[in-house]
Regions:
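Helix-loop-strand module that forms the ligand-binding subsite of alpha/beta enzymes
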Residues: 55-138
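A generic structural motif
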Residues: 29-36, 139-141
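Glycine-rich phosphate/pyrophosphate-binding loop and the adjoining helix
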Residues: 5, 141-185
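Short hydrophobic segments within beta-strands
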Residues: 7-9, 37, 115
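N-terminal beta1-alpha1 ligand-phosphate binding loop
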Residues: 2-31
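N-terminal beta-loop-helix "entrance" segment that forms/cooperates
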Residues: 37-55, 154-158
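Hydrophobic/aromatic residues located in beta-strands of well-ordered beta-sheets
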Residues: 4, 34, 112, 142-143
Length: 185
C-alpha cells in the first residue's frame, strides 16, 4: 500500500483544509496509508542555521523522503499560498550538505496532489502558484495538474466554522483520489 503524506497549509486547529484532508483520508481508506506532516516547529529559513540543519527540518525531510507521494491541502492567502507553507518548501529545496547541489533532495521527483478550501476563488491562485513553485528546476516535484479540487466555502462555513461539502464537491474529490492513486502507481 502506498504511503501518502498530507501537508496542511493552515496551522489553525479547526482548519477547513484539515477537514478537507480528513474527507480525503476517508476516501483513501484501505487503498493507501495516510500520515499528516507536523511542521509547526520548523524555523524560518535562515542560512545562518542551515548546516547542520535544525532537528525539525531533518524530521520533515525524513518524512517527505519516506512517503511515496504528497498531498497538499492549502487555503489561499492574498492570491497565493501561506508563508509557513512556503517556508517548509524552502527548507525542502535546500541542499542537505553545504555546497552539494548533486545529491537529490527528498522532494525531487515526489508526486504531489493539490487541493484547497477557501473563498470565492476556491484556491485557484494558490494551487497555480504551488504548481509553479514545486516544478521549479531545483525542486522538481511531479505535480498532478489535473484533476485538482478547489472548494469554495459557503457563508455558513465562515460564520459557523463547519464545512459541508456538496455531493458534486465530494464527487470531485473522489475523482481526484482515484486519479492520484493511478498517478502514483
Amino acid at each position: 500500500m502506498k504511503k501518502i503524506l498530507f501537508i496542511i497549509g493552515s496551522l489553525r486547529k479547526e482548519s477547513f483544509n484539515k477537514k478537507l484532508a480528513k474527507e480525503v483520508e476517508e476516501m483513501l481508506a484501505r487503498r493507501a496509508t495516510v500520515e499528516y506532516l507536523d511542521y509547526s516547529d520548523v524555523p524560518l529559513m535562515n542560512q545562518d542555521i542551515e548546516f547542520p540543519a535544525p532537528e525539525a527540518v531533518k524530521r520533515v525531510r525524513g518524512k517527505v523522503a519516506e512517503a511515496d507521494a504528497l498531498w497538499i491541502f492549502s487555503p489561499e492567502y492574498n492570491y497565493s499560498y501561506p508563508g509557513h507553507l512556503k517556508n517548509l518548501i524552502d527548507w525542502l529545496s535546500r541542499p542537505l550538505v553545504a555546497g552539494d547541489r548533486q545529491t537529490p533532495l527528498s522532494i525531487n521527483g515526489k508526486k504531489v496532489a493539490l487541493s484547497g478550501a477557501g473563498g470565492a476563488s476556491a484556491t485557484t491562485k494558490c494551487r497555480e502558484k504551488l504548481t509553479e513553485l514545486l516544478t521549479l528546476p531545483f525542486i522538481k516535484a511531479d505535480v498532478m495538474t489535473e484533476p485538482q479540487t478547489g472548494i469554495q466555502l459557503n457563508m455558513e462555513a465562515w460564520t459557523e466554522g463547519r464545512m459541508m461539502l456538496t455531493d458534486a464537491q465530494k464527487e470531485n474529490l473522489r475523482l481526484q483520489v482515484d486519479a492520484f492513486l493511478e498517478y502514483i502507481g
